Design a protein with these regions (language model features):
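Alpha/beta-hydrolase fold catalytic core
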Residues: 1-15, 35-38, 75-76, 182, ...
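Conserved HGGG/HGGXW glycine-rich cap/lid loop of the alpha/beta-hydrolase fold
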Residues: 4-52
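Active-site loop/oxyanion-hole signature of alpha/beta-hydrolase fold enzymes
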Residues: 28, 32, 41-82, 245
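Gly/Ala-rich beta-loop-alpha elbow adjacent to hydrolase catalytic centers
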Residues: 82, 86, 90
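Flexible "cap/lid" loop of the alpha/beta hydrolase fold
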Residues: 92-95, 102-134
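Conserved alpha/beta-hydrolase catalytic His-Asp/Glu region
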Residues: 116, 131-185
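Conserved serine/cysteine hydrolase catalytic core
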Residues: 165-219
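Catalytic histidine-centered segment of alpha/beta-hydrolase-like enzymes
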Residues: 231-244
């Protein structure tokens, strides 16, 4: 699958992978900052952003997409940053290709199985009457009945775009994501160990990490460093300056 990506900067390659229902757009500001030091590739994973849609949606497909992307763009031994679902893709890639990654940064996700509790968000997105609404405000009003947090609503509504007729449409492949939602919570699908330098940046207020996960992390990523920031799940959005500082210090 030929993935859409944004590239900027020169130097050592740095690949950034967004989370579920996100896109390369979410990483624009940080990507620009990192481009002062690296050749940054911000990728839209399948069924997200401007990348193609497919009924197949699991970590095997996402990992193979990343392998194909690197081959096609002649990227060797990059640093990789992955948030949430993107972090799971990055971890699977690193374990499957242990000599194919220089340094790995995983943001607010660990290599365990999760019960994905986004059913309400999916219901809300599917309930927006795209054929009737004419403004994003109308879309947000419809979504507010399902999601009380305005920041989360704005995040989800970044997936709305207008087609050639001027009507709203979803960039994300909602049917495929909805069908395979629990698969995004799967544990590691590849077995092995990645011995390269690894940094886990987790949110203190997030449900995705607990201190009891440290042993599991160290079993698969023995050279992992684990750092907590005072955030929820969207670490890089809530504390962008602290996050960027940690990333740049680690990648030096």
């Amino acid at each position: 699958m030929k993935l859409f990506f944004r590239q900027q900067g020169q130097g050592k390659p740095l690949i950034i992978l967004h989370g579920l229902l996100g896109s390369s757009d979410n990483w624009h500001s940080l990507g620009k900052l990192f481009a002062d030091s690296f050749s940054v590739y911000i990728v839209d994973q399948r069924n997200h952003g401007q990348s193609p849609h497919s009924n197949e949606f699991n970590y095997k497909a996402l990992t193979e997409d990343l392998e194909e992307f690197m081959t096609e763009n002649k990227i060797e031994n990059p640093h990789i940053i992955g948030h949430s679902m993107g972090g799971k893709t990055a971890m699977n890639f690193a374990v499957k290709n242990p000599t194919g990654v220089d340094k790995l940064i995983v943001v607010d996700i660990v290599p365990k199985k999760y019960l994905v509790r986004h059913d309400r968000l999916m219901e809300g997105m599917k309930a927006i009457p795209l054929e009737k609404i004419t403004t994003r405000t109308e879309a947000e009003v419809a979504l507010a009945g399902y999601e009380p947090d305005p920041a989360v609503r704005q995040f989800l509504l970044k997936n709305l775009s207008r087609n050639n007729e001027g009507r709203f449409t979803w960039r994300v492949n909602l049917p495929a994501i909805d069908q395979h939602l629990q698969e995004t919570g799967e544990a590691m699908i590849y077995k092995g160990v990645f011995h390269g330098p690894t940094l886990f940046i987790n949110g203190k207020k997030s449900d995705y990490y607990h201190v009891t996960d440290d042993d599991l992390i160290k079993n698969i990523f023995p050279n992992a460093e684990i750092i907590l920031l005072d955030t929820g799940h969207w670490v890089q959005a809530e504390r962008p300056q602290e996050f960027a500082h940690l990333v740049l210090q680690f990648l030096k």
